[in-house]
Structures are given as C-alpha cells and as structure tokens.
UniProtKB/Swiss-Prot annotation:
This is Ectonucleoside triphosphate diphosphohydrolase 2. It comes from Mus musculus (Mouse). ATP binds at residues 204-208. PANTHER family: ADENOSINE/GUANOSINE DIPHOSPHATASE, ECTONUCLEOSIDE TRIPHOSPHATE DIPHOSPHOHYDROLASE 2. The keyword Signal does not apply. GO terms for cellular component: basement membrane; plasma membrane. In the nervous system, could hydrolyze ATP and other nucleotides to regulate purinergic neurotransmission. Hydrolyzes ADP only to a marginal extent. The keyword Hydrolase applies. Glycans are attached at residues 64, 129, 294, 319, 378, 443. The chain crosses the membrane at residues 5-25, 463-483. Its cofactor is Ca(2+); Mg(2+). Disulfide bonds join 75-99, 242-284, 265-310, 323-328, 377-399.
Amino acid sequence: MAGKLVSLVPPLLLAAVGLAGLLLLCVPTQDVREPPALKYGIVLDAGSSHTSMFVYKWPADKENDTGIVGQHSSCDVRGGGISSYANDPSRAGQSLVECLEQALRDVPKDRYASTPLYLGATAGMRLLNLTSPEATAKVLEAVTQTLTRYPFDFRGARILSGQDEGVFGWVTANYLLENFIKYGWVGRWIRPRKGTLGAMDLGGASTQITFETTSPSEDPDNEVHLRLYGQHYRVYTHSFLCYGRDQVLQRLLASALQIHRFHPCWPKGYSTQVLLREVYQSPCTMGQRPQTFNSSATVSLSGTSNAALCRDLVSGLFNISSCPFSQCSFNGVFQPPVAGNFIAFSAFYYTVDFLKTVMGLPVGTLKQLEDATETTCNQTWAELQARVPGQQTRLPDYCAVAMFIHQLLSRGYRFDERSFRGVVFEKKAADTAVGWALGYMLNLTNLIPADLPGLRKGTHFSSWVALLLLFTVLILAALVLLLRQVRSAKSPGAL
C-alpha cells in the first residue's frame, strides 16, 4: 500500500507545479515593450554674446523617468547674440540657419515631427526689451519665422526671466549629477542622501546664484518652490542684471574713462581705440554716461597692469553698505548664508580654467584665487601673448574678469575659505553642458515628474507563451503518469 502512495508522488508534484504556474500566469501583468527608439529635443540658448544649440536625446518610452536624458550634439551659432541684430532683425533669424541645418542631420528624419524645438533668450534680450520693446518683438518674430520653416515641433521663442535662468540651471546641474534621484544597483529608483548642490552661472549680461535653503526667504521674489520626484525643494535664486561678463567689462571701461583715462585692468603695452557710442549704448552704462559727449568720437586707451587700481575699480561695482534685510549679498538683495557644495559654470569656468591651465596657478582656495588674479593682472601684454600666442580677442580682459569673480564670490556672495572649498568650476556634467537649457526642456516636456516613478514588473509576451506551454505540458505529463499508475494498480498482477 505504501509503495502505491509513493508512486503517486511524482505525478502529483508535476500537477501541482503546473497548476501553480498557470495560476501565476493568469495574474494581471503590465505590457513590456521591446528596447525603445530614441526621442530628441532641441533648445536654442540665445545668450547676450552668442547663441548655442543643444540637441538632447532619451529613450522614447521614458517620458516620466529620469537619469536618461543626455546631450546628443551641440552647435555654436556664428556671430553675436540675437539682440545684436536689433537694427536688422531679419539677420537674427538667418544667423540660426547653419545650426538648424546641422540639427536636420543629427536628428533622424522619422523623428522630426516629434522633436520639440525651443528658443529661450536671456539677459541680452532682457536688456534690449528695456530700451526698445519694438525691436525686441521684431527680433523674436524674425527668429520665429525661421524656426517654423523647419520640420520640427516648434514650441515657441520667449525671453526667460532671471529667476527662470537661475532655477533651470540649478535643475540641470542636479539632474545630471543624479542628486534628485538615481537608478540603484538593486534595479529600482532611489533618492541619494548627498543632497543638492548650488549653481552659479556667469553669462554675458547677467549672473545667477541658486541654492537650496531650509529657511523662508525674507524677499518672496527670491524664493521658488519645486516638487520633483515626490520631494519638496525650497530654492533661493537671484539674477543680477548687468553683472554678466560682457556688461561688467563695459562698466569697467566706462569707469576707467571717467576716473583714470587709462585702464588699470588691461595689460601694460596693450592699447586700443574705444568708440564712445559702444561704451554708453548699453542700459548698464547709462548711469555713467556723460551729460554731453560725441557719440561718434573715439578715445585711445592704454593698459597699465595695475592690480591694486583694478581691484578698486571692480570694488565700485558692489554696494555692500546698504541692506534692508537681516542679511544681504550686495545692492540691497537678500541672501541667506551660502551652504553646501556649488558648481560654477559658463564664464566662471572659462576664467578659472585660464588661471589654472594657461597661467599655471593654483586656485583651490580663495587666497589662491586672489593671488592668481593679482599675478595675472601684473602681467604685461608681451608676457601674456607669450603664454597664448595668436590669441588676441579675450586675452586683455582675463585680469578684469578674474578680479570680478573673486570680488563677486568673496564680497558679493560672502563665500569664506571654508565654504569656498565646496565650489567646483565645471563646463560639463555627465558629458552634457551645464546651463539652463536642459532644465528648461525637462520642465516644458514634463520629463521630470512631480512624484517618484513607480516600479513595474512584466513578462515579455513570447516568454509568457513559452511558460504557458511548459506548465500545460507538465500537467498533461502528470495526468499521463497518474493514469498509468491507476491502470498498473488495477492489473491482475498488481500487489
């Protein structure tokens, strides 16, 4: 009798496994797609000095995930920024054609219609809008006409506010560095514990500082609330118009003409003819404009390599004596104390990189940055040219910009030696340029969800069919074995 029971165990086990498998296969599942094709997005960063085009890419089925958008290609538009075409708006649109033609080559043809195309203009156009709203509208109209002629999904050309520029730069940096969320080795999304880092951007006409803060801002205009992946962020941000690299240089030039009749920040042995109209045509130098002057006149100006006088000239850009709040950065703007790590990009990066690679000077501390700036400012024109043969365009201005950066960080934003150790100067993160453009596109295309992505598990249809057949075969095999056991038990020779 015991032998009969033992002989029934194998077919019963097979039947149990088969039935369990069939029951599991009947549980509702999610469809799992095959490896997806790529989607693309294009952003034109219309800055004050030039326009850059960025083409981004991501898996087509990851519209609401993260850690997957990267830079596919980029293109620098020849010529100045679109605001420089205020007197001939049609040229603003024409200037974009070469890079847009590259976009046609970089994006697969079958993806043209689904590729969003954005143009965002920053401080250069904000300045133009202050002096000539009519010219601003015509420039935007001209670039819109050009962009709509291309087969992409054009979604508008607009002027970003300073707050937008700061916040989107902060989003870009933290997104690329996976500070919001990352895909862990266990196969699911996790929230890193390292926290976010602040972002500092130095453009041509404005500079922005943005960082997460725990306390409410005393000035509501400087506070932004974001909800990303189920996490709330209170962010401080401020944009200083007229404190971008190019506008700072214009303001220093106007001050040098007014105070010295020579330029202490320029290297000794360098001189040039300065057209007064170009110095005073910007809204940023309007307060320094003489009551009467010949706009078509030119003035010869020479450099003196005087670091001390250059420092005094730059210091005049910052008003740190007046503050209507409990604490300020400069010009009466509220700012909480800087804390945590920061990434500084754009002209911050290029200037500090010059000090490190061309001048061969350390810049790891505020004191080293100050010393490197002073060393650069004391160089003659011949000494600078010997270091970078053939480079003429930006070489005379590295002293002034480096001096401005040191003053901005130490006197303006109130970094000390301890907090400065958390500042890194970078051009890219995860092989993607750091700036507002990616954050802008992520926001407008809803590629960053407000809540944490859900975890889905599914089975490919072909695998599901194979398992169904396997478990069916197991059940049939079990039935065959049971029938054989029963017949064997009923046979005359069975015990």
